[in-house]
Design a protein with these regions (language model features):
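Catalytic-core signature of thiol
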Residues: 1-244
Length: 244
């Protein structure tokens, strides 16, 4: 069982989101900055990244967030997500070592917050905010854009059902970062009827789930966010003429 940079263990190397909570984040709430009206909305993400067996979910999920709007920066790739986002976030986070060449000790993991700082440093975003309630997450998805979340992944979540729906039962197996890119007030799922769901783009390739995506019931998203989770919102996205 791999040990991560903060001393915790993960049952799957791909799951290496570390928890880093800063009390100052409470001063940067998204509430009041986006309309509260909820509507069905999917933010297009024409990039499908695959972290393989690398523990670089923060780099890949933030790269998906940077790709999920019309005029996104072109050329974002697996190597960019790993080397330019994940490795650089590790060099600037609170823990020793990393997965980059020459790191000592050499091990995996970084935080959603450290990934946000790197995206801001590169100029992909002007700033970032936080959603501290499920209502604010849904309002953001309905009216503003994607949401980067850090959560505990559970052993039932590795394979969605044929319709793309995830089950959150089971035990924690590791921390994961993933891009939430849509919200549907009603979507029909065979055997479940119409559900209120969010849509997520995972970083396990286009063949995973439903074209690389999965769905969560809104109440399930609320449950996992309340379980040491976090929801970070990129603000003021920019298309860069050249990748860092």
């Amino acid at each position: 069982m791999p040990t991560l940079r903060d001393g915790t263990d993960t049952q799957d190397r791909r799951l290496d989101r570390l928890q880093e909570f800063d009390d100052r984040s409470k001063d940067y709430d998204i509430r009041g900055l986006v309309p509260e009206t909820l509507k069905t909305k999917t933010w297009q993400c024409p990039v499908w990244l695959d972290q393989g067996q690398e523990g670089a979910c923060v780099g890949f999920s933030w790269s998906h967030c940077a790709s999920a709007y019309k005029d996104h920066t072109r050329g974002i790739s697996n190597s960019f997500a790993e080397q330019k986002v994940y490795w650089e976030a590790q060099k600037n986070d609170p823990w020793p070592g990393g997965a980059y060449p020459g790191a000592n000790p050499h091990n995996d993991g970084t935080s959603v917050l450290s990934g946000a700082k790197i995206m801001q440093q590169y100029g992909f975003i002007d700033s970032y905010r936080w959603a501290f309630s499920i209502d604010d997450v849904l309002a953001t998805l309905s009216n503003h854009g994607v949401v980067e979340i850090g959560i505990w992944w559970r052993d039932s979540m590795f394979d969605p059902d044929p319709s793309g729906l995830l089950d959150i039962s089971g035990q924690h197996v590791g921390g994961h970062a993933i891009c939430v890119r849509g919200h549907a007030l009603k979507r029909r799922f065979p055997g479940h009827g119409e559900l209120h769901v969010v849509r997520l783009r995972n970083s396990w390739g286009k063949t995973w789930g439903l074209d690389g995506d999965c769905f969560l019931r809104v109440e399930d998203l609320e449950t996992i966010l309340n379980d040491d989770g976090e929801a970070c919102i990129p603000m003021g996205k920019h298309s860069l003429k050249q990748l860092p």
